[in-house]
């Protein structure tokens, strides 16, 4: 498995799993046209905040990691993987590589992730990575609307990890 910064040519594989997002927070990224595919992939390839997860370095995109910088030394992180590759450890392995990159290369002090209360796989992954559950924000954000057009709000957990906690785990 390899991690590289997102490149425009990954748009076909990326669009394949975003054409039917399973987690509401990615519904806003749902791709419906080829033009949207290319436009979104181009945005993701413009900086290093989106990282492609490739299976066996063979250009087979199986997921992505992403981060957003918050001054002075904090990063919001996340991931999205093709359903076909779940349960094989790829998300954990690649997230560890992302943590190493952010703590060592970007000099992060703190990482955090928002996870919806019904996204059990991501909750479990955060815990395996040594992240602490810091709290639950009730009706925190809306990604979708119900059949009447009323926003459906998500309960969202926040997980976090400090660099010093990460370093203790690596011993």
Question: What are these model-derived regions, one by one?
Answer:
Residues 31, 42-45, 130, 145:
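Generic secondary-structure transition motif, activating predominantly at the C-termini of alpha-helices
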Residues 33-36, 45-47, 82-84:
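Juxtamembrane/interface motifs at transmembrane-helix termini
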Residues 41-53, 63:
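A short helix-loop-beta-strand connector motif used in the catalytic cores of GNAT acetyltransferases and
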Residues 25, 38, 49, 57-60:
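Short linear motifs in intrinsically disordered/low-complexity regions
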Residues 14-15, 26-29, 44-48, 75-79:
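Short charge-dense sequence patches
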Residues 22-42:
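Conserved GNAT-fold acetyl-CoA-binding loop/helix
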Residues 23-24, 47-50, 108:
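A general structural signal for well-ordered secondary-structure junctions
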Residues 1-21, 54-171:
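Acyl-donor (CoA/ACP) binding surface of acyl/acetyltransferases
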């Amino acid at each position: 498995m390899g991690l590289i910064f997102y490149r425009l040519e990954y748009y076909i594989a990326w669009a394949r799993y975003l054409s039917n997002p399973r987690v509401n927070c990615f519904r806003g990224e749902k791709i419906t046209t080829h033009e949207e595919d290319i436009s979104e992939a181009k945005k993701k390839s413009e900086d290093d905040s989106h990282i492609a997860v490739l299976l066996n370095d063979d250009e087979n995109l199986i997921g992505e990691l992403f981060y957003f910088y918050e001054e002075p030394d904090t990063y919001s992180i996340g991931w999205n993987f093709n359903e076909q590759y779940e349960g094989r450890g790829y998300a954990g392995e690649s997230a560890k590589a992302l943590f190493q990159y952010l703590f060592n290369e970007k000099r992060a002090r703190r990482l955090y992730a928002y996870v919806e209360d019904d996204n059990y796989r991501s909750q479990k992954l955060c815990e395996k990575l040594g992240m602490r559950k810091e709290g639950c924000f009730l009706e925190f954000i809306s990604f979708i609307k119900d059949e009447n057009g009323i926003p459906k709000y998500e309960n969202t957990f926040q997980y976090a990890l400090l660099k010093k906690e990460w370093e203790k785990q690596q011993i």
